[in-house]
A protein has these predicted regions:
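Generic hydrophobic, aliphatic-rich segments that mediate packing or membrane embedding
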Residues: 75-78, 82, 103, 117, ...
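Short alpha-helical segments in extracytoplasmic peptidoglycan/chitin-binding modules
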Residues: 75, 107, 121
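Short, amphipathic alpha-helical "recognition" segments used to contact nucleic acids or chromatin
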Residues: 101-114
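Charged, often Cys/His-bearing segments associated with DNA-binding zinc-finger transcription factors
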Residues: 1-93, 147-148, 153, 347, ...
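Short, flexible loop/turn motifs enriched in small residues
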Residues: 76, 101-102, 202-207
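Short, well-ordered secondary-structure "scaffold" segments embedded in the functional core
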Residues: 117-120, 124-393
Length: 393
């Protein structure tokens, strides 16, 4: 019943004006009667509920599965599962008369899925704009605190499956994860010591999303709190993954490696492309092509994430912390319902061009172990290519 009520209000503007006025009139009458504490007979209550149910059912019958998913990004069954998981949380906003967990979840999903102004979203749910904003913050807090394990680093069987997946689809051995980045706009943050470090070259404020993905594009670690202006190598160093790479890379990777672009430092645990000096041999070109194919997995997931949850393009929050929670919430939902978003994308570019790490003032060409490992993998790709040519000649 709650789901039907929410959808009826949300889609009111999709129907005739008379239908909208009917919904609004009924809602106003109900609130007035509650305030005046009018007593009604049980039979009258049942009759009104039956009338509402008929109206809501009529609306639902016209709402296809694809229509529901286009509005909320999840299917009805996935939404029901999300409501079930978040129902035990102590929601502040559902104290309002007639407001349920269903309303809270659907309102938050709608807000995250569109760039529609907050006041417009509030009008759909017949509540205030401030309540929508508070509700969205609450939703993100509950999702990230109760469902955080949906984003986790692969170990054991999961790690082996990712390695096998990258080998079969891309052709690079021992690859555990790939990393991609993009930027998330924010308002001038008020919860950081120096907000100006978050101002980019265009005069806007933004943070960098750095996301690690497995072979399926599932997020295994995300960071969304550092300034966009920071070089990728600096952001990596400040993340938990970067710290683990410095302190105990064996425990993190178990002999495997991460793939990143040329903005990251090369090591035996973190492989990058060969610098393109226009003199690369066939083996190195082949290696670089496979690296680019693997990086497309992460950038594809990021692109799809921002396409599905368009609010990430205009969160309009003055808090880095709240922005980070919203980003992580969208990544968690992406992981939970991966099959919903597993679609091909055309645009898989990075957010901004940065200098390769080895061209930075403090950069270097890579550790000896990284240089050697990259050479060995490229050489093995060359041998495989020659072997295949021989077999089919």
């Amino acid at each position: 019943m709650a789901l039907q009520t929410c959808i009826a209000f949300l889609l009111a503007d999709s129907y005739d004006v008379e239908d909208f006025l009917f919904f609004k009139k009924n809602a106003t009458r109900k609130r007035r009667k509650v305030r005046m504490k009018l007593k009604t007979e049980p039979s009258d209550d049942l009759q009104r509920e039956d009338e509402k149910r008929d109206i809501f059912n009529a609306v639902l019958q016209s709402l296809t599965i694809s229509d529901f998913k286009s509005h909320f990004q999840l299917t009805t069954s996935q939404t029901e599962e999300l409501v079930r998981l978040l129902a035990p949380c102590k929601w502040t906003a559902i104290r309002q008369e007639g407001w349920t967990v269903w309303h809270a979840v659907l309102a938050s999903l709608w807000a995250l899925s569109t760039q529609e102004a907050y006041h417009s979203v509030a009008n759909r749910f017949h509540i205030t704009e401030s309540l929508i904003c508070v509700q969205l913050d609450e939703f993100c807090t509950f999702v990230t605190s109760n469902l955080a394990n949906e984003i986790h680093w692969p170990h054991g069987e999961e790690a082996e499956m990712s390695v096998v997946g990258f080998l079969s689809t891309v052709g690079l051995p021992d690859t555990l994860c790939v990393v991609g980045t993009c930027f998330i706009p924010v308002e001038k943050p008020t919860d950081v010591p120096d907000p100006e470090v978050y101002r980019d070259t265009e005069g806007s404020y933004s943070i960098k999303l750095m996301a690690f993905c497995n072979h399926k594009g599932r997020f295994t670690y995300v960071s969304a709190e550092h300034p966009r202006n920071w070089h990728n190598s600096r952001v990596l160093s400040a993340t938990e993954v970067g710290k683990a790479l410095r302190e105990n890379p064996v425990a993190l990777l178990h002999g495997k490696h991460i793939i990143g672009n040329s903005t990251f430092p090369l090591s035996e645990h973190f492989l990058t492309p060969f610098p393109d000096y226009a003199t690369l041999g066939q083996k190195k070109v082949c290696y670089n092509q496979k690296v680019q194919s693997s990086l497309a997995v992460a950038q594809g997931s990021i692109h799809t994430l921002r396409s599905c949850f368009q609010r990430l393009r205009c969160l309009q929050k003055h808090s880095v912390c709240q922005t980070s929670l919203a980003v992580k919430t969208c990544c968690i939902l992406y992981n939970m319902f991966l099959e919903t978003y597993n679609v091909l994308v055309d645009c898989i570019g990075d957010d901004v061009t940065q200098k390769p790490f080895h061209e930075l003032r403090y950069g270097h060409s890579g550790s000896l172990g990284g240089i050697s490992k990259r050479q060995d993998i490229a050489a093995s790709l060359g041998r495989t290519t020659k072997k295949r040519k021989y077999m089919y000649s």
